């Protein structure tokens, strides 16, 4: 059969030309409830005046509680963001910003970033500006490190629950597998040696070469900091297995209550110091410092996700060199670097900002926890981040069976989204091992909007409790926990 030609003589086809496997891969994960909730919000966004019955976005970990402090600083110091004309003394000239700059980042900005990271980590670790590699946000930093540390079909181990975006960030373009390290609520979802080994064995049985462990500390979605002993256990695990550790610490400056953050950078530095004191090159484990890499960003602690500023930090010379080469695909604009170098170099402002931001986050966190408690909904005890880990496991008991299920969790999530009009992230999208947990973000909206959201949850719980009392009165004792919980919640509300 001859080739069919269009009228102009070109070969025709019944469909569009094929795209690459990366472009058409389902590994992006856009069909997950995490992204579906965002879509529902985009289609029906809440507005107090224009759309009061719309969806409230509680699935976005964005820090808006202190943006006014940065706005105030720039009003008082307009030169920080000003464009002057060359030679007029009115700030960096347009020419300075427009022409090619050092791909490794401006020296004054890397120096300011190093000092800022030291400050928010309590001065317990030092950062060499020459080892800072800039990227367009933490998403780019994590993907860049994945490209450097692993090959397609290799595996990274990630303790659960973890940030849903990691399935996209680490897998989609790299071809690397993500293997969950299953943690549970019995110990506050802390990582254990047994859980790490089980995940490693699972990956090996599937024919995957494990190349590293990635953790978030403070945790997204838990809003907690990792215990020192847990971090030491992870360091020992990666050393014994000759693999890497990536520690995503983008919420380091958002720790607002005890215990204080323990960064892996602090542990590596103290370990290296002890080794030097003993006259050794390292701490006895083969190159522990060489296998630990830190990711940071200004998106959360400064509330600047639109500026796209991320950092890869490593003591491994080969990793730093590779990251610099690859960072040409994910540069930070000169204007962004110059503006933020001015802001971060003002020590008095930075000190005031960090203290105020932590105080505001604690106040907002406590407000949410108290509001949920009044509605009869507990949360995991948190001390960091922009979210709470909400426990709705009791609402799943009796939903289609005696035990809570992930199917029941998704039905509850759908009700919260479609009926209550709240976009929260279900625990299953974070690969949580227990159904019934939800991540609820609280810093990306006004206090007034947050109170609307809490009132909606309270009304939903009222309705659920009233329905549950009648529904379960005739059931067996193993259902009584739900009945008693509902009765207690309902009677307590009436007494108020």
UniProtKB/Swiss-Prot annotation:
Its EC number is 4.4.1.14. Expressed in leaves. Expressed in shoots and leaf blades. Expressed at low levels in leaf sheaths. It is an enzyme of class 4 (lyase). Keywords: Ethylene biosynthesis, Lyase, Pyridoxal phosphate, S-adenosyl-L-methionine. InterPro entries: Aminotransferase_I/II_large, Ethylene_sulfur-biosynth, NHTrfase_class1_PyrdxlP-BS, PyrdxlP-dep_Trfase, PyrdxlP-dep_Trfase_major, PyrdxlP-dep_Trfase_small. The modification N6-(pyridoxal phosphate)lysine is found at residue 300. The keyword Lyase applies. Pathway: Alkene biosynthesis; ethylene biosynthesis via S-adenosyl-L-methionine; ethylene from S-adenosyl-L-methionine: step 1/2. It catalyses: S-adenosyl-L-methionine = 1-aminocyclopropane-1-carboxylate + S-methyl-5'-thioadenosine + H(+). Coiled coil: none annotated. It holds the Pfam family Aminotran_1_2. One of its GO terms (biological process) is ethylene biosynthetic process. The keyword Thylakoid does not apply. Its cofactor is pyridoxal 5'-phosphate. Belongs to the class-I pyridoxal-phosphate-dependent aminotransferase family. This is 1-aminocyclopropane-1-carboxylate synthase 4.
């Amino acid at each position: 059969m001859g080739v069919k030609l269009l009228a102009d003589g070109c070969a025709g086809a019944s469909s569009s030309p094929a795209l690459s496997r990366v472009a058409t891969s389902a590994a992006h994960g856009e069909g997950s409830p995490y992204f579906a909730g965002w879509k529902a919000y985009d289609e029906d966004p809440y507005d107090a005046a224009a759309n009061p019955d719309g969806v409230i976005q509680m699935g976005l970990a964005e820090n808006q509680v202190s943006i006014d402090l940065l706005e105030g600083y720039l009003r008082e110091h307009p030169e920080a963001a000003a464009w002057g004309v060359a030679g007029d003394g009115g700030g960096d000239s347009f020419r300075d910003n427009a022409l090619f700059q050092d791909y490794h980042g401006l020296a004054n900005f890397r120096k300011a970033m190093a000092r800022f990271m030291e400050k928010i980590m309590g001065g317990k670790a030092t950062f060499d500006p020459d080892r800072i590699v800039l990227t367009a946000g933490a998403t780019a930093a994590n993907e860049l490190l994945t490209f450097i540390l692993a090959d397609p079909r290799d595996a990274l181990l990630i303790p659960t629950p973890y940030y849903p975006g990691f399935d996209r960030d680490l897998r989609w373009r790299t071809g690397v597998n993500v293997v969950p390290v299953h943690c549970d609520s019995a110990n506050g979802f802390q990582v254990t040696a047994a859980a790490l080994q089980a995940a490693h064995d699972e990956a090996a049985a599937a024919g995957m070469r494990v190349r590293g462990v990635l953790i978030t500390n403070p945790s997204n979605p838990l809003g907690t900091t990792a215990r020192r002993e847990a971090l030491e256990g992870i360091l020992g695990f990666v050393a014994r297995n000759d693999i890497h550790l990536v520690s995503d610490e983008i919420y380091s400056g958002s720790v607002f209550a005890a215990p204080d953050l323990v960064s892996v950078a602090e542990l590596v530095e103290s370990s290296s110091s002890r080794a030097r004191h003993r006259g050794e090159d390292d701490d006895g484990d083969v190159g522990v410092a060489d296998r630990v890499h830190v990711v940071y960003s200004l998106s959360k602690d400064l509330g600047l996700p639109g500026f796209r500023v991320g950092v890869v930090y490593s003591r491994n010379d080969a990793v730093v060199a590779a990251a610099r080469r690859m960072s040409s695909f994910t540069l930070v604009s000169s204007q962004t670097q110059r503006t933020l170098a001015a802001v971060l170099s003002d020590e008095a402002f930075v000190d005031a900002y960090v203290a105020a931001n932590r105080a505001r986050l604690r106040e907002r966190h406590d407000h949410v926890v108290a509001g949920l408690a009044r509605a009869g909904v507990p949360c995991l005890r948190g001390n960091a981040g922009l979210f709470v880990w909400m426990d709705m496991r009791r609402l799943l008991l009796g939903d289609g069976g005696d035990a809570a299920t992930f199917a029941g969790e998704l039905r509850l999530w759908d009700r919260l989204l479609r009926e209550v009009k709240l976009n929260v992230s279900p625990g299953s999208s974070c690969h949580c091992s227990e159904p019934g947990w939800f991540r609820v973000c609280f810093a990306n909206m006004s206090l007034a909007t947050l109170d609307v959201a809490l009132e909606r949850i309270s009304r939903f719980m009222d309705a659920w409790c009233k329905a549950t009392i009648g529904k379960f009165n005739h059931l067996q004792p193993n259902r009584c926990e739900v009945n008693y919980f509902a009765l207690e919640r309902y009677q307590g509300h009436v007494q108020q």
